[in-house]
């Protein structure tokens, strides 16, 4: 495992429980859900937009450009983009990352 320190837990709280961070050139979306911290690639696999709308009740994140929706625990696309309703969802998932709180800072396992 290669844990990389990102931002403080306070920054996540100040951002409403969701934040995008840059880790070694990868933009990672981090959200605090009902079952802990989750991280996934923050760049939508459809049009390369940054994800931005975390829905805690469904544990999903929505792309702000075209509405594609991804599970934060698996990265699986569960709703296609509105402009491409026939997109091959099984091929458009996102990489997930382990995230932890280490002494008040969020760390992401980049392996």
From Swiss-Prot:
Gene3D superfamilies in UniProt: Rieske [2Fe-2S] iron-sulphur domain
Note on cofactor: Binds 1 [2Fe-2S] cluster per subunit.
Cofactor: [2Fe-2S] cluster
Residue stretches making up the Rieske domain: 3-108
UniProt keyword terms in alphabetical order: 2Fe-2S, Cytoplasm, Electron transport, Iron, Iron-sulfur, Metal-binding, Oxidoreductase, Transport
PROSITE patterns given in the database record: RIESKE
GO cellular component, one term: cytoplasm
Keyword Iron-sulfur part of the UniProt annotation: yes
Subcellular location per the Swiss-Prot or TrEMBL entry: Cytoplasm
Annotated binding of [2Fe-2S] cluster, by residue: 44, 46, 63, 66
UniProt xrefs under InterPro entries: Rieske_2Fe-2S, Rieske_2Fe-2S_sf, SDX-like
SUPFAM superfamilies: ISP domain (SSF50022)
GO molecular function: 2 iron, 2 sulfur cluster binding; metal ion binding; oxidoreductase activity
Domain of life of the source: Archaea
Family: Belongs to the SDX family.
NCBIfam families: SDX_Thmprot (NF041174)
Protein name: Probable sulredoxin
Organism in which the protein naturally occurs: Thermoplasma acidophilum (strain ATCC 25905 / DSM 1728 / JCM 9062 / NBRC 15155 / AMRC-C165)
Gene: sdx
